[in-house]
Structure formats: structure tokens, C-alpha cells
Amino acid sequence: MKPILSLLTALLLAPLAMSAFGAEAKTSLVHSPNGDGGLIASDQNHPLKVCWPAFDYDGKAVGTEAAFSTAMVAGSQAATAHHAGESRTMTAADGKMQVRLDCRSYKGFPAEEYDVRLTNLSKTEPTGITSNFRSLKLSVGTPESARAVTLNVLRGSTCKATDFIPESFTIEAGKERVLTTTCGRSSNDYVPFLELNLDDRNGYLFAVGWTGSWKARFANTGNAVEVEIGMERTHFRLMPGETIRQPSVLVFARKNQTRREFKTLFHRFMLDNKVPRDSKGRVIPPILAVASGGGNKTPQMMADILQYCVENKMPFDTYWVDAGWYGAPHEDELFSNCGPNWGKYVGDWRVNTTTHPTGDLLPIANAVHKAGLKFLLWFEPERMTDSAPILKTHPDYRRGQLVDYGNPDALKWIQDTIYGIITKHRIDVYRQDFNMDPGPVWRTVDAADRVGIAEAKHIAGMYRFLDDMRARFPDILQENCASGGRRIDMEMIARAHTYCRSDYYIGRKPKDTAFILGQNATLNLIPYLPFQGCEFNCVPVGDDYAAFSIVSSGTVITPSDFNGGIIRRKLTTDETAWFKKVFDVAARMKPFYMGDFHPLADETGAGDDVWCAWQCDRPDLKSGFAIFFRRGAAKEESRTFELGGITPNAKYEVECYDGSKKTVGGSELRNWTVELKPRSFQLVFYRVY
């Protein structure tokens, strides 16, 4: 085998391998048989260079008939405490099309990231046709003994019990696997974190940053695996002066690690480098929320829910007002949640004055802030029904029901509208939903020589909407729903938390399917999406196994979903005591999700016949928790789990969910044996004694 090379170092040593300079040219990532192969984070010994995208220009592969020159962007080389970066451009010989590649190498992690933008430098003429554009095209060398490689992924969110279950594809020599999401929402089909395993301890994770339709191809040639990642459909010319962005891709190496160890490292990378931070640079923590539907019949119902929480000293830190609070004056029925009209008035962001006579939500917002909680409000800014008043003067602001974020005037209008509501109500958590598939709209809009442009402009506009909001309200938390977990990708995770990771949790479901999904989503998804959660209303009161299957780094409960609790009836003393017990423990667990996440089992699927377990450890606090589930049909009565971050010669105080405590040695805690009855769990908190 060849010496170990990082993707960037390979380019330094063999620049003619770049796809910009040769037909179907490849960059070689060399895998080492001794276990330490893979990407090497750039440092003084491995200077940062670039890997060019691949595409056709006017029907010819870039680097053959169409010549492109390359250049460093002056002043682009920069370094921070977390990463080093630089930018380069490649420009067509016709002087029109220019591709800019922004590269970033992360310190302390085997990770490199590529962000791509295309510009027409001409002020008078369109470019030639760019097609089959791939933000990343490279070749990964395989071990000499390997004839097959494995691609591990998670299914996306489709409101089914099988959301986020693992899938594994074996790619034999001479075969390929193509994954894509075609509807326009990034995690509808697959979660775009694609794990290529070269053997049991080495491989690469490709994390796609694109909140639209992406496509990834993995082809095993026998000696290497060719990897191509980009938008699903591209065949366009750029208009004079026009700029668009393309998917970003993060490449993260697994070097001599088990897959569980690798997921712990990647989770740490996400916390250190990707999750949203406030104006002081601090990670914005996950939330524990109590919710009221926006479609309540009177504002007093919202106030009653808040008062219930205050009187019973519930540990919630956020008050959540969901859909249904907006639209032309109308009276809602006494529904327990959002009411029957929540979808009818989307796009009309006037407060419903029949329910809220003041014409705003200040009575509840002010009361929430007075009680010391954060105020969350639901929006769906990208969709607009026929009820929207703006359509009378600006019908061009939407296409179908999709607000045209590629139209600067439409984008400014929705920004001014939503930002104004945020300012008036001092909103702490902005919740963004998106309940449509935009892909068909984009395909209808695109001309034959502009395929992909409507999508690219909409996605860029959506990022600008969120980024401008962050600049204006630097301490706001953005939350990303999209019909429950259908827009989970690297770009959105860097901007928002997700507290409705699947809509399958809404309402009671057959047997334990919702609770198994809860376990799966936390174990399988948290390495990529550290701050997540879902609705609690699928949980029967008093069912601890169900409750802690659902509780994650964040959780939300709507009390009225429990047979109209608070709104239509008083919650009983027993119900209140159980809610308080569960959520006091959830609040205790929450800070540990800010530390190291250790999967204690491999990814679990939808079956009821396995154990599921994970651990959250805070090295800075010398404490953490671990939780273990024996599902209903699991045959093993006991399991021994290897916990992470435990000091073998230390003493630990261990406290179980039932309140029992004992002191154990680190070696015992590190190899923790759990004996459980079917359909039961054990939750243990530990700290150095």
C-alpha cells in the first residue's frame, strides 16, 4: 500500500489528479492496512489544499475541451482556534463561469469540509450549460483484501415506526449504490450522513449540507470506491452576474476505531464545531418545553397551562405556542391542540383577533417571561395558502403554495413580517415548520436550461432568512420541524435544534412502536443531531418505560393532549405527581447531553426483540448517566455493557431511577451488568465519589 495521505495532502503531492484538470480525474484517499489510515487534519505538516468539484460544461467534462484556470483567493487563508481555511477559484476559458471552493480543515478532528458557489462573471451574457454538478468527487482506496465495502445509513423521517432505523448496503466490486432524496426535503428518504466502511475499523463519513434534494453515488471499482455527492438534478446556465450555491460536504475519517467509538468522536465534533451558539459563543442548550396549541378557543387556556406549571413547580424552561394562532378573525372549536384551521391560514401572519382580542400574543408572552421561561412560537414561513392578504398585491410572491425565497422582494417581505413578530413578542425560540414537498414545485418552475436553479435559489434564500435572523437576534434559538424531522442535514443542524424529529409520535400508536422509535431516534441519531426531541403525548400516564423511551436531550409535552388536560378538565393529583416525577428526572438528564455521547449498543431497528442503551458523560463534572432498555420480546435477561469515560481505579456513587444508591468501583461501573424483566428499563446516574 502507498503511504498515508490526507485528501488535502494528496492534492499537494499530485495536483494533476484534480477533476478540474483531467477527464474523470480522481483524488486518491489512501487507506492504510495498519489501522491509522484516513484523513489527517491539516496542520504545519499537512498544508491545506483543495479538491475541486466535477461537472460538465457545455457537454464536456471539465478539464478536457473546456479549459479552466485556477487561482487562490487573495487573503482567504485564515485560521481560528477550531479550523484552518482557504478559498480557491476555477474559471472557464470563456471568462464567464467561475467556481469558488471554500475549504476548511478542523483542528483536533480528522475532518475536512468543502463549500461550493458558482458565479457568472459576465455582466452581459449567460454562461454555457453546467450539468451533472458534483460538489465532491473523489476515490477512496480500499484494502487489498477487500472485494466489498459497506455503506451504513439511517432511513429518513416519513411518519412511520421505521423512521431512523439503520440500513446497511454491501457494495461488491463492479457494483454501485445511489442514494437520493427527491422530494426537496433533505432527510425525507435518508438522513444525509453516509458512512462508508472499508473494514471493521476504518472508513469515512460523508455529511451532506443541503436542505433540498441531494444525490450520492458510491461505486466500487475493485481497487477503490468512487464517491460523488451533489444536487439531485443540475442542467443550467447562469444569467449575467448570477451566483448560486451548491451542497457542502464534510468528510470525516474513522481511523482504527469501532463504529461506536467513531460516533462518540463525531458527536464531540458536532458539539465543538457545529451546534448553534449564542452571542457569547456558548452552546445553546436543549429545551424542556410545555406546549399549548395555538388554536385554543380563548387566551385563558394558554394562561391556565402556564399557571398549572408554576403552581406545581414543573421544571420546564420553555413555553411553546404551536400552530393555529394566526389568520383572519375566526372562532376555533374547543380542540385540545392546534384546532381545525391551523393549515387553512398559513401565510396570513396576523394574529387571530377572535381568540386574541389584543391583536397580539403579548398577554401570554409577557406572562411566560415573568415566570422565567423562554417563549417559543410556531411559524411556517415558506408556505402560503390562498388566505394570505399579500397575494392581493403580490401574487408573484409564491409558486404553488411555496413562498418564492429566490425572489428578493418576497424574501424581504417574509423577513420583515416574521422578524417584526419576533421583536414585538421577544420570542426566545423560533420554531420553523415546513409541511410540503417543494421538489415538484421547483421542477415545474425550472426552464429546460435552468434545471436546479429554483431549488438552489430557494435553499440559499432560506439559509439567508435564518442567518439574518441570527444576526439580528443573536441569542435566539431556531428550531427545525418540517413535518417532523424531514430537514435534518449538516446545514440545518448548524442553525437549529429539532424537537419534533418525527410526527409518528403524535397520538397513541400500536403496541410499543412509538416508544421503540423513541429509543431508536436517540441512540441512532444523536451522534449527528445532538439536540433533539419529540412530543410526549403518545405516552400513557404512569408508564415509565414509555416515558423514558421518549425523553431525549429535549422533550415537549402538551398537557391538553392528555384527554383535554387543563383546558377541558383538571389533571388529577396522581397525574400531576407522575408528570412532575418524570420531567424532574428529564431535567436532571438534560445537561449531560452537553457532554460525550456513548452508544452502548449498535444502532437498533424497529424490532421489539433487542436491548437498547446509551450513556451521556460529562468529563468536566466527573458524572453522567446511562440508560438501558430491554424491549418486550428481547430474550436475554441480562447484559453487560462497557461504559465510556469511566476511571477504573475511582469510586463512584450510583443512583438508580427508583432512588436506590450505592458506591461501586470504577471497574465495576465500566463493565456494568444489567438484569431486567421484559419491557423494562434501568436509568443510573453516577458521579465520582
Where does each model-flagged region fall?
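Bacterial N-terminal signal peptides
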Residues: L8-S19
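Polysaccharide-binding surfaces and accessory modules of carbohydrate-active proteins
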Residues: E24-G222, E232, E655-D658, T663
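Active-site-proximal substrate-binding groove within the catalytic cores of carbohydrate-active enzymes
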Residues: A41, D58-G63, Q246, M436, ...
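Glycine-rich, aromatic-flanked loop segments that form ligand/cofactor-binding clefts
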Residues: C51-M72, P192-G209, N256-P276, N312, ...
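Conserved, mostly hydrophobic/aromatic
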Residues: V116, G241, Y319, V368, ...
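Short Pro-Gly-centered flexible turn/kink motifs
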Residues: F236-K255, R679-Y686
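Aromatic-lined carbohydrate-binding/catalytic grooves of carbohydrate-active enzymes
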Residues: G281-D416, H425-V429, G439-V441
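C-terminal beta-strand-rich structural cap/linker in extracellular carbohydrate-active enzymes
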Residues: G665-Y689
